[in-house]
Amino acid sequence: MSGVSRRRLLTATASAGALGALSACSANDWSVSGKGDANASAHKRPAKLIGDGSTADTGAQPGQPKAERLKPGERPPQFVVFSWDGAGELSNKLFSRFRTIAAEHDASMTFFLSGIYTLPESKKHLYRPPQHPVGASAIGYLSDRHIHATLQQIRAAWLEGHEIGTHFNGHFCGTDGVRRWSPAEWRSEIEQATRFVTEWKTNTGFTDLQPLPFDYRKELIGGRTPCLEGQANLLPTAAELGWKYDASSPGGLQIWPGKVQGGRIWDFPLQSIPFPGHSFQVLSMDYNLMANQSNANPLGDRAQYAAWRAQARDSYLAGFRRAYESNRAPFFIGNHFERWNGGIYMDAVEQAITRIATHDDVRMVSFRQLVQWLEAQDPAVLRKLRTLNPGQSPLGGWAEFLGTAASPSDTAAS
């Protein structure tokens, strides 16, 4: 693939943003709530400050659904997870835009926060990336005002029921990137990302912001690596840290998820989905759509924007329909807060959310909420669900297919 590299593209986007140039449905007893005043309705009990007061233990997260085990013969709900890499609030206010959209459609999402988005550039000497010079980063540091705005968004998002995961720090891709890191180096990167989030008050000097209302070391149960690279050596560290899932697989199919790393980590890959007008499929992420539409050029032919926007939206909807009308495999869509090709991919995601939300049995959830549901199920049922291929409906219908548990000889869920 030629054109602008993903690393250069994300660096340019974040740097421009730092300068200010860039600008569900519920079913049964699973009601994904993101409602109310994020600052007023959160928790009645007093917050217990942690460390320097950057974070606080405020109790159970609001707006969390109760995971119920499927009844024999019951059709699974259609889970859809929208996740966001980086999760910084720049002048384009995309973080706040999609919080609003989520609230309008009773959706929870996962925001993979880049740790250095809470670290001022004046303090970049505190970041010691593996195999790179002190303070180095392939993405730009945010301006102080954008760090301030990002912290506000992270606080509000969590109080609305969204998940805060990690996108790590420096976003190093390619031959000298994270694919070369050892498990020990991944641990260093994770510890630094966590420290930047839990010590933002010390590092920024901000005194007008409330603490993030969660213990990040407990909140953090998964992430997505830069450019979907380096998963093999991340997984041992993730398992040691007690993480529940990883979303860094370089690509998967629309089947029910299983576990990796000896059955300790749920594997949630981006998925190959139909690409309208083509015989091949595309990975369910904005960057991959752009790579195929404008050869990874974020300033492609403006005359094509309307057609590309519709194609991106229809690709997401085709992926959704394939799962919804067949095996009901959870559908994963990944994105960045970006304005590539005039912002068409943000519009495409918004349009997809709006249309998906009109369907029955749809639950737009975070990865954390999906983990909780999966772990509430009969393992035999999950094994049986994993025997269904992309686009394959259960023989005889759901009542017959899940009327009895899978036999031990069925495909294992791990």
List PLM regions with ranges:
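Active-site-adjacent pocket scaffolds in enzyme catalytic domains
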Residues: G36, A40-T55, R128-D144, L209-N327, ...
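Active-site beta->alpha N-cap acidic-glycine motif
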Residues: I50-E163, G170-G174, N203-P236, G252-L253, ...
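Generic structural signal for well-ordered alpha-helices
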Residues: F95, R99, T150-R155, R187-V197, ...
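Sec-exported extracytoplasmic/periplasmic mature domains
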Residues: A103-A107, L159, R195-T202, A239, ...
